Design a protein with these regions (language model features):
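Histidine-centered nuclease catalytic patch
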Residues: 2-77
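Extended charged
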Residues: 72-278
């Protein structure tokens, strides 16, 4: 039997905790069984809570007694601070990030390296949800996050910092890091990653592999519902599997181009929802 809670239970636990760890408010969470799973394979929301990976590790190893767990559950950090929608609260209904002068707008995978979805974005119930797959220099999968849920990986080597609309994950040796600032739109995104034994850097200037900048061959465009595909030899772009109606928006003014891309994304999303309903 899978330990992953049903969607309705998971949603209730996230909402009651203010979309963050009950103990500290971090937006990257795991689902914790206060009444231990080993003795009772249950999904009772009253006996579960959400914790960040480090507090979850403490709780499962006995360093956080049940009474303390229940105090955190009854008084979640974000709720006490008036952050009912968590630290990654956003008001927009779309995701956008800049890579050089190119803006990607949509939801789902934004960057894929050597066939792996490295970075994805979604809009949750008023908050930004990120997905990450981060690899070591030897191409070992170090961590996986799916829509703000820590799926796999040892949390101890990682420094996770969060502030209002900001999130940083940094590996202890500082060889790998990802940070985002969701205050501006498009979001500001930076990353120092490894894939296939090569170092990949992502920032507002573009994408760099082992120090060499990857030319897009395009400038001053918005890619709507499109994912960047990177391998060790080339960079390309194409429709995300989730967004078959992808388009490219060309407009001289960057702010107006973003608005036009946003409107196109809303049209695409309506088409996808309509097709799924058939």
């Amino acid at each position: 039997m899978s330990r992953k809670p049903p969607a309705a239970v998971a949603r209730q636990l996230r909402q009651e905790a203010g979309f963050g760890c009950c103990a500290c408010g971090l937006p990257i969470i795991q689902y914790h069984h206060i009444v231990e799973w080993a003795g009772d394979q249950h999904f009772r929301a009253q006996d579960m809570m959400v914790l960040c990976p480090l507090h979850h590790d403490q709780a499962t190893k006995g360093a956080m007694p049940e009474a303390e767990q229940r105090r955190f559950k009854a008084n979640p950090c974000n709720i006490q601070r008036g952050l009912a929608q968590g630290l990654l609260k956003v008001s927009q209904d779309y995701c956008a990030a800049n890579f050089g002068s190119v803006t990607i707008v949509g939801e789902g995978p934004f960057v894929r390296i050597d066939g792996e979805n490295i970075q994805s974005f979604h809009i949750g119930p008023g908050n930004l949800e990120i997905s990450l797959r981060l690899f070591s220099k030897t191409d070992e999968l170090l961590l996986e996050i799916d829509r703000n849920e820590w799926i796999s990986g040892d949390p101890l080597p990682w420094d996770i910092e969060a502030d209002w609309q900001k999130l940083t994950l940094r590996e202890s040796s500082r060889q790998i890091s990802v940070s985002l600032n969701a205050k501006p739109v498009p979001v500001e995104l930076k990353g120092e990653l490894w894939r296939g034994g090569k170092r990949a850097s992502l920032d507002a200037r573009g994408i760099h592999i082992d120090g060499a900048t990857y030319p897009f061959g395009i400038e001053e465009l918005a890619l709507v519902g499109i994912v960047l595909n990177i391998d060790t030899g080339k960079l390309s772009f194409g429709a995300s599997p989730q967004n078959p109606y992808a388009v490219i928006v060309s407009w001289p003014d960057r702010r107006e181009r973003l608005w036009k891309a946003r409107d196109k994304w809303r049209e695409i999303k309506a088409k996808v929802l309509s097709a799924d309903a058939r």
